[in-house]
């Protein structure tokens, strides 16, 4: 196992806001499922279960990195990092980035020299306290409210809803576009009903 590396550097503006406010749906999503644990699902205890309609709830796990005093600061933890002479960085192995309330986990992350965007791939998860998005690949613009994820699954914790999309794009503050998407409030592995668009 490699040595863990942590580093903190300042950056500007937001990484990813709360998800799906005003989202538009188009086409039909691929039928892939994730295990309940991968969607931050927790079953009710035996004492809680009789009073509940559903079998559990979505609960965000604790952040892996501590909050920084300056919410614009980008904190990074990884097993390996390669720096190029021009300032580019490739982070590999259990990469975690946190900025404000948003935390990104992935197997590989590429940071260009200008640090204006993050390209992440491999078992990625983005959490911001209100939502979880999992996907295969993501590009996040660090100085703008823009992001793009392919083959994503999403959860809104407080609304008890989940879905998936072949493409999820944040096009501005609280503006999202989903392609080939689904939406449901059913428990994981249960699709008694869902919207498909």
Regions found by a protein language model. Name each.
Residues 2-28:
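Gram-negative bacterial Sec-dependent N-terminal signal peptides
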Residues 30-197:
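Structural signature for solvent-exposed beta-strand/loop edge elements and short helix-capping sites
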């Amino acid at each position: 196992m490699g040595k863990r590396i942590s580093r903190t550097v300042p950056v500007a503006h937001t990484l990813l806001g709360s998800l799906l406010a005003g989202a538009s749906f188009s086409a039909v999503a691929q039928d892939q499922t994730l295990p309940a644990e991968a969607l931050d699902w927790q079953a009710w205890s035996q004492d809680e279960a009789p009073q509940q309609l559903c079998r559990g709830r979505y609960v965000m796990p604790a952040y892996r990195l501590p909050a920084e005093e300056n919410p614009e600061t980008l904190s990074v933890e990884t097993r390996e990092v390669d720096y190029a002479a021009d300032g580019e960085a490739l982070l590999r192995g259990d990469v975690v980035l946190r900025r404000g309330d948003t935390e990104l986990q992935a197997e590989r992350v590429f940071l260009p020299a200008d640090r204006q965007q993050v390209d992440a791939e491999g078992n990625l998860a983005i959490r911001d306290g209100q939502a979880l998005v999992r996907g295969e690949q993501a590009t996040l613009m660090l100085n703008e409210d823009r992001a793009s994820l392919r083959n994503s699954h999403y959860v809104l914790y407080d609304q008890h809803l989940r879905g998936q999309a072949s493409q999820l794009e944040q096009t501005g503050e609280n503006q999202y576009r989903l392609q080939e998407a689904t939406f449901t409030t059913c428990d994981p592995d249960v699709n008694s009903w869902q919207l498909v668009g």
